[in-house]
Amino acid sequence: MGQCGITSSKTVLVFLNLIFWGAAGILCYVGAYVFITYDDYDHFFEDVYTLIPAVVIIAVGALLFIIGLIGCCATIRESRCGLATFVIILLLVFVTEVVVVVLGYVYRAKVENEVDRSIQKVYKTYNGTNPDAASRAIDYVQRQLHCCGIHNYSDWENTDWFKETKNQSVPLSCCRETASSCNGSLANPSDLYAEGCEALVVKKLQEIMMHVIWAALAFAAIQLLGMLCACIVLCRRSRDPAYELLITGGAYA
């Protein structure tokens, strides 16, 4: 019966180590996605410390790949030292992921205030030229999120760009995709996106932060199961004389 429990734990442990390799790739992808998205929205969110959870989760992903390799070798060879190392590293990674979750919630709460502070400045510097980074960022966000202005398209009337052009129109990036004849004129508001960009940028950034949080929580749960299985194998190996005899007399002695 004890041997059956050992075999089951080892089988689950090997399977979990294979999952760790997959998890490593997923975590690195999530972290990279945060970096790429931040690059698209960095004008609206200047606090680079928000990237800390992404940096940590990429590091955890790389470490999980190594952990999976150590775990597989230690489980197959039934190495007490290897399994103990495996458990300790998993515990450290688990603690790190808890930190990622906490940081994720902290920075998620800061998103709204940070965007509100930055977006006003970005819209004021808009000049409508492609080489200008702020102008490109605004046009990109308005096209991607289907929005116009900070709260709505009327916000453009308060910008220097609107006053200087004197043509009573907003940027073409405010035009709905279905309005083929749209020229940005305020005389045809039905051709323009009605929703403002601030709320949508906040929502987008908070969703990304939640992806990091859920990824960390999901893989932390898997790591707990991995630590449990490794501890079962270690404990049975130490307490069961018959199991110890089987190991020392086998191929991996």
From Swiss-Prot:
Residues 1-11, 72-85, 234-253 are cytoplasmic. Its main location: membrane. InterPro entries: Tetraspanin/Peripherin, Tetraspanin_animals, Tetraspanin_CS, Tetraspanin_EC2_sf. The keyword Membrane applies. Residues 33-50, 107-212 are extracellular. It is a multi-pass membrane protein. GO terms for cellular component: plasma membrane. Glycans are attached at residues 127, 152, 167, 183. Keywords: Glycoprotein, Membrane, Transmembrane, Transmembrane helix. It comes from the Eukaryota. It is found in: Membrane. It holds the Pfam family Tetraspanin. The keyword Ribosomal protein does not apply. The chain crosses the membrane at residues 12-32, 51-71, 86-106, 213-233. Belongs to the tetraspanin (TM4SF) family. Regulates the proliferation and migration of oligodendrocytes, a process essential for normal myelination and repair. Interacts with claudin-11/CLDN11 and integrins. This is Tetraspanin-3. It comes from Bos taurus (Bovine).
